[in-house]
Amino acid sequence: MKKVGILNSEISKIVADMGHMDTLAVVDLGFPIPQGVKKVDLVVDRGKPGLMEVIEILLRELKVERIILAKEMDEKSIQTKQELLKLIEKMNGPVEVVTVPHKEFKEMSKNVKGIIRTGADIPYSNVILVGGVIF
């Protein structure tokens, strides 16, 4: 039995397969999952697990160089955005932050390696992580 790192076998595989510029989406419980994209559904209840909890665990193993957020976060969930940026910088170091309209974010999610659905119930609490390099 694996005893350290990401214990969810599906997420562990997605993270292990991530290369430079590959993308992984971590989304709220209402996000529409595109057909044909690998989905890992972690939701057990509203808010559980939360977005930050999942991001923190992912960043223990995944190097990120850029994140993509919906512009609507600035109006609907600015506190979540600020917490997310603080957590990512703490765990990963500085990253480029790209914001796009939510409609474009949904289109971009059609091309990710996987989507992890959290229990987050805060509007627009979705992020696309873009893989970096460790050298």
Curated annotation (Swiss-Prot):
EC number: 5.4.99.62
Keyword Isomerase annotated: yes
Record has Cytoplasm as a keyword: yes
Listed transmembrane segments: none
Record-annotated active site: 20
Subunit structure: Homodecamer.
Organism: Thermotoga maritima (strain ATCC 43589 / DSM 3109 / JCM 10099 / NBRC 100826 / MSB8)
EC primary class: isomerase
Gene from which the chain derives: rbsD
Alphabetically ordered keywords of this record: Carbohydrate metabolism, Cytoplasm, Isomerase
Xref: InterPro entries: D-ribose_pyranase (IPR023064), RbsD-like_sf (IPR023750), RbsD_FucU (IPR007721)
GO molecular function, one term: intramolecular lyase activity
Name of the protein this chain belongs to: D-ribose pyranase
NCBIfam families registered for this protein in UniProt: PRK11797.1 (NF008761)
Binding site for substrate: 28, 102, 124-126
